[in-house]
Amino acid sequence: MDAYRAVVDKRDQRVYLPKPIPDEALRRILQAARMTGSSKNREPNRLIVVTEREGVRALAALSEWGRWLAHAAAVIVIAQVEPHEFDAGRCAQNMMIAAWADGIGSCPAHLPEAEVARLLGIPRDVHVNRVIGFGSVDPVRAAAPKSVARRRKPIEELVHRERW
């Protein structure tokens, strides 16, 4: 899948097949994170990869809105000593696009930072910035017609040239 197709076709996925992510696919996801550009080339992102079922389920139990994570094959937490929202967002998007290109679905989740940190043994001076679930998607479900939620505003409504 080329980069453009991966970007425009990607959809958040919260339903996964009950199988692990192949090691090579997970390695590519992590490599995409590692190669993410960062402000002043600081490389602030640190990744905690959770694949053991007990840990994945414990993360899912931290928030009503994160319950779907219980079925993820992996949860990756982006942590930073100094919070850099922009850099964390770039890293998250790189991982999710790389995953989608390999047929792996993903979706960010909002979990309480302090509880994630406690559960994963993250030091007090390190900030939990993003939590993302990953898993193999049903190819039929992934190829289904785009839902109403996936429709986007026309480009003419979003883009202004030269001035507002």
Predicted regions and their residues:
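Acidic, surface-exposed loops and disordered segments
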Residues: 1-164
